[in-house]
Amino acid sequence: MRKKTVQIMISHSLMIGLWASAFPGIRAGLEGYTPEHLALFRLLIGSMALLLFAVLTQMRLPDLKDIPAIFLLGFLGFAFYHILLNIGEKTVSAGVASLLVTTAPIFSAMLSRLFYKEHFGFTKWLGSMISLLGVLLIAFGAGDFTYSMSGILVILLAAFSESIYFVFQARYIKKYGFIPFVTFTIWGGTIPMLVFLPGLGEEMMNASISATLSIVYLGLLPTVIPYFALAYVTSFVGASEATLSLYVTPALALIISWLWIGEIPTLLSLLGGVVTVGGVCFTYLKVNKMNKIFITHFSAKRVKKL
């Protein structure tokens, strides 16, 4: 039991650390590559690593009827998401980008309400409004409002694209398993990205070694390993608890960005980030039933006295 607990803690650490490091890694990669080539190079490396893994584990391929949907989810969750995130990070700092991406759970909740009629109560709407206020604070704190706002909107669109991937993946994860599904969707996201292949070789020749190594790191580690770690943790504690620790990611991303690329966000941007993450957390706040009973009882008592 203790060994399993240690393994879960290590998995959580891998998820938080690797995903947090991806944001400054993108900024470092953009020093030598365009957003499109960076996304393609990163996904190619991840796809090749997963291809080797699939061969070694004799992974079963998806049914033909599921391939169009899996490829579409791969395009939205990986290709489109990474291109937009890379474009956004041209004008938005790595730390702020990581804070903006935490809005994905709110978009997921809204989509679940729209397509699956899941409950989207008052706390979720209020949390969404709080997060929107945080986004505005981030925009004002970034300096040139018009310049930074375009990058912020692009990253929010990336978060929305990723939320579509999260909402509609359930049936395929249930059918194929988490790791095979992630493998298939990364492949599905890589194939349409091949349209950007022309010019990649030339950029590799001209880019600095540090920029290229940053993308190799992104492709081998943050693109692949955290998903496997998430699958491992989910198998023991469930998806909700497994993803809960990901709210720590922006805080660590800010620290890594400072140490890796010397990026220091403004105080107003940090405040906006705290408000944004707070809004996301508030969106998923669950009021304890006993607290409801206590509040009702206390209110009734007070009315009686009056």
Swiss-Prot record:
EamA domain ranges (all copies): 17-140, 160-285
Gene3D superfamilies found in the cross-reference section: 1.10.3730.20
Chief location: membrane
Listed GO CC annotations: plasma membrane
Keyword annotations from UniProtKB, A to Z: Cell membrane, Membrane, Repeat, Transmembrane, Transmembrane helix, Transport
Record keyword Cell membrane present: yes
Membrane-spanning ranges: 6-26, 37-57, 67-87, 91-111, 125-145, 148-168, 177-197, 213-233, 251-271
Pfam families: EamA
Location within or outside the cell: Cell membrane
Alphabetical list of InterPro entries matching this protein: Alkyne_AA_exporter, EamA_dom
Topology versus the membrane: Multi-pass membrane protein
Family in the record: Belongs to the EamA transporter family.
Name of protein: Uncharacterized transporter YdfC
Species the sequence originates in: Bacillus subtilis (strain 168)
